Amino acid sequence: MAAPEAEVLSSAAVPDLEWYEKSEETHASQIELLETSSTQEPLNASEAFCPRDCMVPVVFPGPVSQEGCCQFTCELLKHIMYQRQQLPLPYEQLKHFYRKPSPQAEEMLKKKPRATTEVSSRKCQQALAELESVLSHLEDFFARTLVPRVLILLGGNALSPKEFYELDLSLLAPYSVDQSLSTAACLRRLFRAIFMADAFSELQAPPLMGTVVMAQGHRNCGEDWFRPKLNYRVPSRGHKLTVTLSCGRPSIRTTAWEDYIWFQAPVTFKGFRE
């Protein structure tokens, strides 16, 4: 999936890297603290979360690239689609299974009735094509603008989804690739934190649902695929997980987030089941 992993920056290349590394020691306690505070502190009524919300902070030991932020988003989307049973296999396995069947896969397909095999293959191809289109346009979007927040909405509609998941990137100050940590190493840290939080184990098995992606970007970024939603408000129900990424201390970048608006993917893509 990713190119061979580059070396993580030395402490000489990244100021205060030693300070960042110490922050990892408090990672587990931060998860517990945020989960506790989410049920105690009053929240804005328009974005109130239910008591079972899972808040997962992930602290990276240094800066990350804008390309890395995009990959975090894409991999989280794939992960949620599989964990919430919208895809029968993880995305990469599914793509390999249907586009270049292994001998075992070919043998399984032979055992199924021809009509069933054709329908299943057609549904899979459509689901993969729709998801790949969204992933591709997310890459273009991240190349145009900083993206402080992303929402992944399942079921219902964009205003009232059955479930929604948030990725908060607003505390990151993206750097160029050669100044940043290895994206592969950051992905391992991200998903380790999600697995430790056990965010999906208590959720009931859902039906197949439509999925919509919302992302914040600069109002003048020139985006022409994602549709601007000037008055969009984050849903008040259905929240399941927020992953907050940071580099261990407030971002040095001073960004006028009031100039950033929500954009909505113009497609609602649906997974499939065999």
UniProtKB/Swiss-Prot annotation:
Pfam families in UniProt: p31comet (PF06581)
Example of a GO cellular component annotation carried by this entry: nucleolus
Compartment list: Nucleus; Cytoplasm, Cytoskeleton, Spindle
Family: Belongs to the MAD2L1BP family.
Name of the protein in question: MAD2L1-binding protein
Domain of life, source organism: Eukaryota
Keyword match Nucleus: yes
Biological process per Gene Ontology, one example term: deactivation of mitotic spindle assembly checkpoint
Residue numbers bearing the Phosphoserine modification: S102
Oligomer and partners: Interacts with MAD2L1.
UniProt KW keywords: Cytoplasm, Cytoskeleton, Nucleus, Phosphoprotein
Region (Interaction with MAD2L1): 45-78
Keyword Phosphoprotein: yes
Alphabetical list of InterPro entries matching this protein: MAD1/Cdc20-bound-Mad2-bd, MAD2L1BP_domain_sf
Job of this protein: May function to silence the spindle checkpoint and allow mitosis to proceed through anaphase by binding MAD2L1 after it has become dissociated from the MAD2L1-CDC20 complex.
